[in-house]
UniProtKB/Swiss-Prot annotation:
This is Large ribosomal subunit protein bL9. GO terms for cellular component: ribonucleoprotein complex; ribosome. One of its GO terms (molecular function) is rRNA binding. GO terms for biological process: translation. SUPFAM superfamilies: L9 N-domain-like, Ribosomal protein L9 C-domain.
Length: 172
């Protein structure tokens, strides 16, 4: 038999803080109650529910504002990656979500895996790509990622003569 609960925190896939939800007894007993993410709903929890909903609304407004600011910042930023390629311009490996998060951190932008709706997203081709992001409070943003080949490999393919080689050729 399912139990009615008052959520104290947002629980993904179940509800948000202040919501009264039903959940299976094992989930309640083994996860929600021990981690203090919920309490069993009763007559005395109505005041707590009102307080939690008010706090959630304030937090949601702040999160939405913060997410919209971040979306505006991300609109103007291009993350650039230099990767090794073979002579046919095929990449060795790929640019993964972890690489994008690390590069964004260098620019003081905090992203997590939760911001990427496609968790196994990987860029395997050269060029500019638009990466969709999901921020807090259902705000979406697009991050531009530009992947280009390393200049050192291009130099190996098209070697520039050194000054010594140029001088030797002029003497001949």
């Amino acid at each position: 038999m399912k139990q009615q609960l008052l959520l104290l925190e947002d629980v993904e896939g179940l509800g948000r803080s202040g919501d009264i939800v039903t959940a299976r007894p094992g989930y309640v007993r083994n996860y929600l109650l021990p981690k203090q993410k919920a309490v069993i709903a009763g007559a005395g929890t109505l005041r707590l529910q009102a307080k939690l909903k008010e706090e959630r609304l304030l937090r949601a407004a702040a999160d939405r504002e913060e997410s919209e600011k971040l979306a505006q910042i991300l609109k103007d930023i291009v993350l650039e990656f230099q990767v090794r390629v073979d002579p046919d311009n095929n990449m060795y490996g790929s640019v993964t979500v972890s690489d994008i998060i690390a590069e964004a951190a260098k620019k003081n932008i905090v992203l997590t895996r939760k911001n990427f709706p496609h968790a196994h997203y990987a860029i395997k081709n050269l060029g500019k790509k638009s990466v969709p992001l999901k921020l807090k409070e259902d705000v979406t943003a697009t991050l531009i990622v530009e992947v280009s080949s390393e200049s050192s490999y291009v130099a190996v393919l098209n070697p520039q003569p050194s000054q010594e080689q140029t001088a030797a050729e002029e003497l001949n």
